């Protein structure tokens, strides 16, 4: 098992290297000169050129890439033009907000989505099944920002149940933390609940059509045991794989949600950096999110091999 884990981690290293190179090259394609941004309006050409030399922007792209990868190897993501602090520090300060939002949304998505999918499979072609499929369609057709704005107007402005913006750290007030995140987390989860329910329903229906399920029913096994012990247990392996993909989507979806609810997380940091053309922050945040997605996929892959030992021999 240890060898398998090491193999999966080793396979992720070149992927991370490719992510790093693509992130660097993408930033080079963006308009604007960081030296002019740092120098400010009205700076002389000599000042701008001096800053370009200090930043190494006068070097060929290949040299800049090599230097950036070397700094990255030493956990140096550069320094923010806008915040006047190391990019790694800016990310570390805002990471707990994004992780809290994604984990809370994940905690809502998984049980609700799985239960809805199982019930929809059991009540196939019923009104509940139709409702679940409609929710899945809603998740891919309705923009998240539109639904988030409606939720703020209804639950925050009109009813006053939840705060419309802001974040309370968990250590300061667990209840305040929950109140500040429950609404954005619910909106974020809503789009994934339908997807997970549809996936669970599909896997359950496929398993329930197998011969061993018919055999169990013919032997008089209760329907509850058939669903929980036989059908769901076998369908859960595929659902586990999807859960990692869902968590990655929740991290990515937090960019819009954090902006609407004024949550000081990585998503809002990225948007502010893009608007201010703070390239080191944009570069560092995108790279960190890319590495995070790769790490999540590796973790899910390892859990998948634990849940289904047959994969180890493929």
From Swiss-Prot:
Record-annotated membrane-spanning stretches: 12-32, 101-121, 135-155, 177-197, 237-257, 286-306
SUPFAM superfamilies xrefs: MetI-like
Protein family: Belongs to the binding-protein-dependent transport system permease family.
GO molecular function, one term: dipeptide transmembrane transporter activity
Domain ABC transmembrane type-1: 95-304
UniProt main location, coarse: membrane
UniProt subcellular location: Cell inner membrane
Its job: Probably part of an ABC transporter complex that could be involved in peptide import. Probably responsible for the translocation of the substrate across the membrane.
GO CC terms in record: plasma membrane
Keyword Hydrolase found: no
Topology term for the membrane: Multi-pass membrane protein
Subunit (UniProt): The complex is composed of two ATP-binding proteins (BAB2_1052 and BAB2_1053), two transmembrane proteins (BAB2_1050 and BAB2_1051) and a solute-binding protein (BAB2_1049).
Pfam families: BPD_transp_1, BPD_transp_1_N
InterPro entries: BPD_transp_1_N, MetI-like, MetI-like_sf
Keywords of this entry: Cell inner membrane, Cell membrane, Membrane, Transmembrane, Transmembrane helix, Transport
Name the UniProt record assigns to this protein: Putative peptide transport system permease protein BAB2_1050
